């Protein structure tokens, strides 16, 4: 469910009004609404754009064949590259491909072949007078996949070529993995070739407005925000628990505190009085808490903070005992 991200939508639409020049990484805390935002953005693009939304969460990706099958889908209507244009919609969940070309890509296990076909499709789209937009959601899923070296860095090099060098397509990579973003941010090869677009939880007043639109009362809305802040996933769930709203809020807090209590971490003590702390580098302790989705690391700001308001309250509950 999409609500009041107009400022972010306008920024994204403005970005694509210029010639492609960067790979844009869309990142933020878990369940902050990144996927919903990017899908709404694609819907709102004009007819001069063709979107591809590739979701690496929709199926396990443990090898090159599975990667290729997420990226491409066989379509019997395609005999030649130029046939692709006639079957594309405004937003497409994969890149259509002739069966024999897909078979060759799967057989050869050479990423360059997959990338070459994708480039040909994008060139055909540009020749038709339209601009492609490539979106890869949860790209970090393939970060450990090896195909003649690191697949993800081969993909990054290709995406940089598409955007910064060939100016063939706007490219977005979406992730909730802040350690992955930290690696990207610290990669010298991506310096000057990547931009970063943070998506945080909704501000509390906007969250209350959202809940009021879901027919919760002012009092009920403020209660939900008191526990969950502007975390969209909890805001959407709240109306289902309206009959026992406070009990639901307390139960979620208790469960989260129980999970956090397993971590004997002195680092968490810093959040007793602070909502965000600056860090020069991530300790092993911090990495474990980020991996457990308790803390969120923002490499652009150089800060650590709880993944959401519920985590902040749970941390303080654990500290107080």
UniProtKB/Swiss-Prot annotation:
Name of the protein described by the UniProt record: Uncharacterized ATP-binding protein PH0541
Listed InterPro entries: AAA+_ATPase, Archaeal_ATPase_domain, ATPase_dom, MJ1010-like_2nd, P-loop_NTPase, WH-like_DNA-bd_sf
Family designation: Belongs to the archaeal ATPase family.
SUPFAM superfamilies: P-loop containing nucleoside triphosphate hydrolases
Keywords: ATP-binding, Nucleotide-binding
GO molecular function: ATP binding; ATP hydrolysis activity
Residues that coordinate or bind ATP: 28-35
């Amino acid at each position: 469910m999409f609500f009041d991200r107009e400022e972010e939508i306008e920024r994204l639409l403005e970005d694509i009004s210029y010639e492609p020049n960067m790979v844009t990484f869309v990142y933020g805390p878990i369940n902050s609404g990144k996927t919903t935002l990017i899908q709404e953005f694609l819907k709102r693009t004009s007819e001069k754009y063709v979107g591809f939304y590739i979701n690496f969460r929709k199926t396990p990706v443990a090898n090159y064949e599975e990667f290729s099958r997420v990226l491409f889908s066989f379509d019997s209507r395609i005999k030649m590259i130029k046939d692709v244009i006639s079957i594309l919609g405004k937003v497409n969940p994969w890149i259509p491909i002739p069966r024999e070309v897909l078979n060759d890509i799967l057989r050869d296990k050479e990423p360059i072949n997959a990338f070459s076909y994708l480039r040909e499709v994008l060139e055909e789209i540009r020749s038709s007078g339209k601009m492609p937009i490539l979106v890869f959601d949860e790209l970090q899923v393939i970060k450990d996949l090896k195909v003649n070296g690191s697949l993800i860095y081969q993909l990054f090099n290709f995406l940089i070529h598409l955007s910064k060098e060939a100016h063939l397509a706007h490219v977005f990579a979406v992730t909730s993995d802040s350690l992955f973003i930290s690696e990207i941010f610290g990669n010298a090869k991506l310096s000057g070739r990547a931009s970063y677009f943070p998506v945080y939880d909704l501000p509390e007043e906007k969250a209350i407005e959202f809940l009021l639109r879901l027919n919760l009362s002012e009092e009920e809305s403020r209660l939900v925000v008191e526990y969950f802040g502007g975390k969209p996933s909890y805001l959407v769930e709240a109306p289902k628990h309206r009959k026992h709203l406070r009990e639901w809020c307390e139960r979620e807090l208790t469960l989260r505190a129980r999970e956090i209590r397993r971590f004997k971490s002195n680092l968490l003590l810093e959040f007793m009085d602070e909502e965000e702390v600056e860090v020069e580098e991530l300790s092993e302790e911090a990495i474990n808490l980020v991996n457990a989705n308790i803390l969120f690391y923002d490499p652009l700001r150089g800060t650590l903070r709880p993944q959401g308001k519920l985590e902040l309250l749970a941390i303080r509950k654990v500290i107080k005992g």
